[in-house]
């Protein structure tokens, strides 16, 4: 009930200003006498996935808490896991503003943020200070000014730094807002990247005497043939999981709505069926070889169940959380 009032006020602000304001307040509430305002006591619905134990199958997708500023506050709301990032080796400002747009009628968002973040070292300091007891995923990417041909180096730098602190590491090669990034999803470039990542993972396993699983985040805009090739590469390189999907570039889904022609990736309800279709196809190709984390347009218990019925072992929310607030977490976890 209270979130509908909060949302009404926040939606009067520019989307990015609303996000920044909300995060400042969440940070203040965390570990304060007023944390009860965001705390939700939810039943345990344990899931084992990628060799990890999750208290429930619902997580927060990357992109909302890029710098790990509000891990504990978000954790208090009942998520089974939280994915922070995307983070890059060096801090970067991202693309020019405005770069985030609401499509309220469709409960969608278009963003062209461009991996704005304070860098991997800042994220690690925030993770160290966190008291969150759930599984923490850390999503990593490449800096905009790193040539795509050398992008692999950025992922390896980030892996080296986050490995001791991550429950799992997510490799983001599917954001549409970093020029050339999505080319890493194809053919030789993908094989080269996955080979380097697997080798680094095994090296770090030896160094730290613990195995941190790696999941690759893919786009919803892959053709069926491209998806078959991606699935084959993931299996051949013994990747631990796949996150499906990132945002779509297909704006036909929101044709005629305000902001529908803005450049960037579309998320929220409009991408729901597209991402579910990718999950279903992936599930058919992978045949259980590795688990799928389903994300894209989950805004209700029904949408969450659709993702899991399509083959997802875990699910994540982002836009749906912005539109529906903590009640969405409660509804899904209570009844999933």
From Swiss-Prot:
Family per record: Belongs to the dihydroorotate dehydrogenase family. Type 2 subfamily.
PANTHER family for this protein: DIHYDROOROTATE DEHYDROGENASE (QUINONE), MITOCHONDRIAL, DIHYDROOROTATE DEHYDROGENASE (QUINONE), MITOCHONDRIAL-RELATED
EC number: 1.3.5.2
First-tier enzyme category under EC: oxidoreductase
Residues at the catalytic site: 175
Pfam family, one: DHO_dh
The keyword Transcription regulation belongs to this UniProt entry's keyword annotation: no
Pathway: Pyrimidine metabolism; UMP biosynthesis via de novo pathway; orotate from (S)-dihydroorotate (quinone route): step 1/1
Membrane topology according to the record: Peripheral membrane protein
Cofactor note: Binds 1 FMN per subunit.
InterPro entries assigned: Aldolase_TIM (IPR013785), DHO_dehydrogenase (IPR050074), Dihydroorotate_DH_1_2 (IPR012135), Dihydroorotate_DH_2 (IPR005719), Dihydroorotate_DH_cat (IPR005720), Dihydroorotate_DH_CS (IPR001295)
Function as written in the Swiss-Prot or TrEMBL entry: Catalyzes the conversion of dihydroorotate to orotate with quinone as electron acceptor.
Binding site for FMN: 62-66, 86, 139, 172, 217, 245, 268, 297, 318-319
Record-given protein name: Dihydroorotate dehydrogenase (quinone)
Residues reported in the UniProt entry to bind substrate: 66, 111-115, 172, 177, 246-247
GO cellular-component term (any): cytoplasm
Subunit structure of this chain's protein: Monomer.
Cellular compartment(s): Cell membrane
The encoding gene: pyrD
GO BP: any one term: 'de novo' UMP biosynthetic process
Record key words, sorted: Cell membrane, Flavoprotein, FMN, Membrane, Oxidoreductase, Pyrimidine biosynthesis
Catalytic activity from the UniProt record: (S)-dihydroorotate + a quinone = orotate + a quinol
The keyword rRNA-binding is assigned to this record: no
GO function term, MF aspect, one: dihydroorotate dehydrogenase (quinone) activity
Cofactor: FMN
